[in-house]
């Protein structure tokens, strides 16, 4: 198992220390004195962002999936054609310099829609000040991916009167990540740590199966493994994969299945998980199951992300790979011209 010395030696910028503080960061963001902004008669919300910022849009898309508000996520340059005066476009770029999101911001400003931006500075701040766009400037904490809860709970606070998300549900999610920390943080580097146990199990390429409601957790886990552990990872919708992807298991491979499950998944989804487990057992394919905590959808997803992000950090340390540098991303950015 990983030791404290290993974390400090490999994780040179101390990413894990930020994750140890996630509950306090979330609480501080939601309790901030930031003024709420209300947008009336909104029936369509567009979340635009890339990478760690884009994961925030995935989260809100899942949370609002059963509301009367249609949610679009944009991970690229183009807004949906359905944007109108009843649309709220939320652009998030932790760095404030994301080329794609700056383009969306500029295009949204030209339309008859509502608009707000969240960032830590950069060109997005300059644009919003110059063009009188509502915005919130937030702290960058280590990296965009580590800043996830700071931005998520700041958005929940700022748009509390616009987003149909109960305050009690938000507070529940913070309580639960506080409880989760007791099991997965660096203060519990033992076999009882589920994040560390999963990290120790991974040796090949993880294939993450998810039910539709937990899609944002799966997307985030894939990205965290890619950025932190510098390894490939695959995600598949459980139900869809049973109509195609499952056939690939007929050949030997280094792929390792991980099943993400909710405590109260739809009955047909539960049945399908049991069927695919039966298939894996019959064919001697080792797999892992990861269950969400109980609670509202925000609570479930945030806690899964917390556990799985930590898994990616532990896996990177076990692989002797510093989780912080993302040199390949910097290469791409250096050749991308912002508008």
Feature roles, as predicted:
Residues 1-12:
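Polybasic, low-complexity association/targeting segments
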Residues 10, 17, 21, 55, ...:
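Conserved active-site and cofactor/substrate-binding residues in soluble primary-metabolism enzymes
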Residues 11-18, 25-33, 37, 43-44, ...:
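Active-site phosphate/pyrophosphate-binding segments
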Residues 23-27, 61, 152-159, 219-226, ...:
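Predominant activation on well-ordered alpha-helical scaffold segments within soluble catalytic domains
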Residues 40-182, 262-267, 271-288:
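Glycine-rich phosphate-binding loops that contact phosphosugars or nucleotide phosphates
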Residues 71-76, 231-242, 286-295:
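A generic structural motif
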Residues 247-327:
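C-terminal active-site/capping subdomain that shapes the small-molecule cofactor and substrate pocket
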Residues 324-339:
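Short, small/acidic-rich helices and loops at N termini and domain boundaries
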């Amino acid at each position: 198992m990983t030791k404290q010395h290993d974390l400090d030696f490999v994780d040179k910028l101390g990413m894990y220390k930020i994750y140890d503080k996630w509950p306090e960061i979330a609480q501080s963001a939601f309790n901030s004195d930031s003024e709420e902004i209300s947008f009336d008669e909104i029936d369509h919300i567009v979340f635009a962002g890339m990478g760690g910022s884009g994961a925030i849009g995935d989260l809100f898309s899942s949370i609002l999936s059963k509301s009367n508000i249609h949610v679009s996520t944009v991970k690229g340059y183009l807004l949906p054609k359905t944007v109108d005066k009843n649309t709220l476009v939320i652009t998030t770029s932790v760095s404030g310099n994301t080329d794609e999101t700056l383009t969306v911001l500029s295009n949204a400003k030209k339309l008859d829609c509502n608009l707000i931006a969240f960032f830590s500075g950069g060109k997005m701040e300059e644009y919003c000040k110059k063009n009188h766009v509502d915005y919130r400037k937030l702290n960058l904490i280590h990296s965009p991916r580590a800043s996830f809860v700071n931005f998520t709970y700041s958005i929940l606070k700022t748009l509390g009167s616009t987003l149909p998300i109960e305050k009690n549900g938000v507070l529940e999610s913070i309580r639960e990540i506080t409880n989760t920390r007791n099991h997965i943080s660096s203060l519990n580097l033992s076999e009882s740590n589920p994040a560390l146990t999963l990290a120790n199990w991974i040796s090949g390429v993880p294939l993450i199966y998810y039910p539709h409601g937990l899609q944002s957790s799966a997307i985030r886990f894939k990205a965290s493994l890619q950025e932190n552990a510098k390894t490939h990872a695959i995600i598949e919708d459980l139900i869809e994969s049973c109509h195609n992807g499952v056939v690939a298991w007929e050949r030997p491979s280094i792929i390792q299945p991980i099943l993400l499950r909710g405590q109260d998944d739809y009955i047909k989804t539960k049945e399908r998980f049991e069927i695919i487990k039966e298939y894996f057992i019959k064919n001697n394919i080792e797999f892992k199951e990861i269950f969400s905590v109980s609670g509202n959808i925000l609570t479930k997803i945030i806690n899964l992300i917390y556990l799985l992000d930590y898994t990616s950090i532990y896996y990177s340390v076990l692989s002797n790979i510093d989780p912080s540098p993302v040199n390949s991303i910097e290469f791409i950015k250096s050749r991308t011209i912002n508008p």
